[in-house]
Amino acid sequence: VRLTQQALMAMADEDGLPLVGAIAAGQPIEAIENINHMVVPEQLKTDNPCYVLQVKGDSMIDAGIFDGDWVVIEQRSHARNGEIVVALIDKNNATLKYIEQYPHETVLIPANKTIKPMRFHPNQVEIQGVLVGQMRSYQHR
């Protein structure tokens, strides 16, 4: 999921951010932009361009990120080891995971003991952004 900085700034208003689709917290899913708009509390935004994704799956449950939650992502192409990132794998599939980067390997680590880490050559993984906030609805639909 990659929007230009101009597109993100144009779509963000005082309270809202672009809601650009879903992110896998499980098996990676195809990265598709489906842009809507979502009101986001000021405390969940940063000074840099941000966007919102809805979580699909249970690979991050031990980090308190559940299926159906909305995550606020700061768009950037770098992250520190241990941060939760939106990772684009092979320029096609996106997932939300902890990241550990080494010279010859990038490891995407779930927060669910039943799911194994995914290991890739660094050229296969592109960081699309870093988690900076989260929202949840307790309404059953």
Model-derived features: positions:
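Short, positionally conserved secondary-structure boundary motifs
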Residues: 1-61, 66, 94, 101-102, ...
